[in-house]
Amino acid sequence: MARQQTKKNYSLRKLKTGTASVAVALTVLGAGFANQTEVRAEGVNATTSLTEKAKYDALKDENTGLRGDQTKLVKKLEEEQEKSKNLEKEKQKLENQALNFQDVIETQEKEKEDLKTTLAKATKENEISEASRKGLSRDLEASRAAKKELEAKHQKLEAENKKLTEANQVSEASRKGLSNDLEASRAAKKELEAKYQKLETDHQALEAKHQKLEADLPKFQRPSRKGLSRDLEASREANKKVTSELTQAKAQLSALEESKKLSEKEKAELQAKLDAQGKALKEQLAKQTEELAKLRAEKAAGSKTPATKPANKERSGRAAQTATRPSQNKGMRSQLPSTGEAANPFFTAAAATVMVSAGMLALKRKEEN
């Protein structure tokens, strides 16, 4: 654009120079014509020869031609001046356009710089976006791997939770069975104590009767001594029998007391063991519940905890057991724990021994289980 503007300026200067040259030439030519006309007029006045007249006519014609040429040149000069004015206007217009073009060029240069800056910024942002996309892809892969690992861990925890729930149910059933056996053992002890008290009372009555017979024996005559002797022997036999039964009852009561001590000790140990297991199970269940909650939060799932279903089943099972337990206990109270025979406060020593043995065996089985 600058080069074209320079060419236009040079053309305008050249046009101005040519126009000035034409004007100078016309001025000189007009002065020459005037001088020739004056000289020729003086010659005509001095001579009147035909030759001079012919020359005069020729010069006149030439002068007329030159004047015509001058008119043409003046007209051409005016046209050139008009062209010069038009060219000057065109020049001004072109200069204004050049200024406008310069503004446009500067604006375009500025826009070009802005575009370069925008392009550089967009390129940098594209690079950052590409790096961010790659980072997000890596994070997504890592998140998927972590999700798979968490799902596997969740399944493992669910399996462990199920096992712990089942173990807790078995432990609860064992504890309830042991409690029932202990209640049966206590009922048997009460019955043995009642029997012991009755035997003790009978023994004291027989002992008093025997002492009375011993005291009354010298008072009776000899003929009735045989009957008294028989009564005394019968009393002694009854006393021996009662004493034997009392001894057996004492032995059974001692055995029951010993078994009760063992049962209490085993019960305490088993209860402590069950309490420790229950506490460990509760802690593990709480820990697993917390881990399950974290897993559910990470998975953004609103499903219920699977571990609560076995708990609901356990509660319903406990409720059913609680509902059926009174009738079972009622039936057990009217029967012996080992033989199933009808309970009798005066049952035999063999039945008591079998009952105590059955209670001990049941306790050992519970402990082994």
From Swiss-Prot:
Entries under InterPro entries matching the protein: LPXTG_anchor, M_anchor, M_repeat, SMCR, SMDRR, YSIRK_signal_dom
GO cellular component labels: extracellular region
Propeptide: 340-369
Keywords for the protein's UniProt record, in alphabetical order: Cell wall, Coiled coil, Peptidoglycan-anchor, Phagocytosis, Repeat, Secreted, Signal, Virulence
Keyword Secreted among record annotations: yes
Cell division listed as a keyword: no
Leader sequence segment: 1-41
A GO biological-process term: phagocytosis
Topology with respect to the bilayer: Peptidoglycan-anchor
D repeat ranges, renumbered to this chain: 272-277, 278-283, 286-291, 293-298
Location in the cell: Secreted, Cell wall
Region (Disordered): 125-189, 202-271, 292-341
Residues recorded with modification Pentaglycyl murein peptidoglycan amidated threonine: T339
C repeats, residue ranges: 120-154, 162-196, 211-246
Region entry 3 X repeats, type B, spans: 132-241
Biased composition (Polar residues): 319-338
Cross-referenced NCBIfam families: LPXTG_anchor, YSIRK_signal
The protein's name: Virulence factor-related M protein
Organismal lineage: Bacteria, Bacillati, Bacillota, Bacilli, Lactobacillales
